[in-house]
Amino acid sequence: PGLAKTMGAEELVCVDLEGVGITRPNRTGLPTTLIRSYWELGDILHFDPATARRNIELGYHDTLRAFGRLRGCAYAVDSGAGSSADAAAFHAAFEAVQKEVREKHPSTLTADIALLLAKLSDAELAPLEAVAEDVGVDPAPYYTTRSLGEAFLAKCDFERLSRFGPLFEGEAGPAQAARAALL
């Protein structure tokens, strides 16, 4: 039946390290919370203090997320009212831009499709998390929606972003729209 159940455990908290080996199914029947990291944690057999520190921070955030204390999928984002209101406002503005781009250039790969492919589960934060990951925002800190947006802007390549201008100014043809979306 499993050691934990035999010793009287009433619930399990399991951490998936995505390590090499055999993963046995949980047949205990106990309520189980599974903690997984979105991020690559590195070689667990090679001890490096900086990597260990980073993994401890990420693991702490993953645990808080698993128990509903944080939002986000890739980034640890505050779940309080202010940060959640900012996430909802960001999502509404993002959706309006998405709609405008789809209407002008229907063949453009839109972010809603890309986000499905990225498997980011928090719909309001997914666009912000995806771009933050794309530019290399550090996943270890604790963020609010606003501070994650600011971290994204600090790492942003504004030259790359300027290529998207024609999508919003109505000057781009379908080929230029597709090129901008892929860059």
Where are these regions (language model features)?
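Patatin-like phospholipase
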Residues: P1-L183
